[in-house]
């Protein structure tokens, strides 16, 4: 979170036309309850981006998407912790609101929290999370071949072949 309350999402996935930059930012925006425009996505530069095993069809959404969700949840927790120490609080994407106790109803904006995090507090408003899964949806492909078989020799001749591939999101 920068001092204006905007987010930077740093991912290792490469957007090869599948839209993962947008999809992963949408996941983060959903968890952080902020407009998509409040998130800048920086992706796939081996000099500074985190490791990602690769962009393989919908597995980017499932695997890197889960890491994005977990990371945004961790960041929400840090925002709430810095926004109000030892009180029951809620966060609606714009401000932290105290729900109970003598400070009930008081709020502090996300930009004020982000600025405070840069000034002598021990809570840094950033999170790094990894996620892996034994289950990841593969891309789907179907192929159909038209062949001719010589019944005397057993020789097979390929006459035509058609394929369709679903590369996922």
Regions found by a protein language model. Name each.
Residues 1-169:
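Cofactor-binding beta-sheet edge motifs in enzyme active sites
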């Amino acid at each position: 979170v920068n001092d204006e309350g905007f987010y930077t999402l740093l991912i290792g996935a490469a957007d090869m036309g599948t839209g993962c930059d947008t999809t992963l930012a949408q996941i983060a925006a959903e968890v952080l309850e902020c407009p998509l425009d409040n998130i800048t996505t920086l992706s796939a530069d081996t000099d500074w981006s985190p490791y990602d095993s690769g962009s393989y069809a919908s597995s980017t959404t499932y695997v890197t998407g889960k890491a994005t969700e977990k990371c945004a949840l961790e960041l929400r927790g840090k925002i709430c912790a810095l926004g109000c120490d030892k009180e029951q609080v809620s966060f609606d994407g714009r401000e932290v609101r105290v729900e109970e106790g003598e400070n009930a109803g008081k709020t502090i904006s996300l930009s004020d929290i982000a600025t405070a995090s840069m000034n002598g507090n021990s809570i840094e408003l950033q999170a790094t999370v990894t996620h892996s899964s034994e289950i990841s949806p593969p891309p789907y492909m179907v192929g159909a071949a038209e062949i001719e078989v010589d019944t005397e020799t057993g020789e097979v001749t390929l006459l035509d072949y058609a394929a369709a591939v679903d590369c996922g999101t």
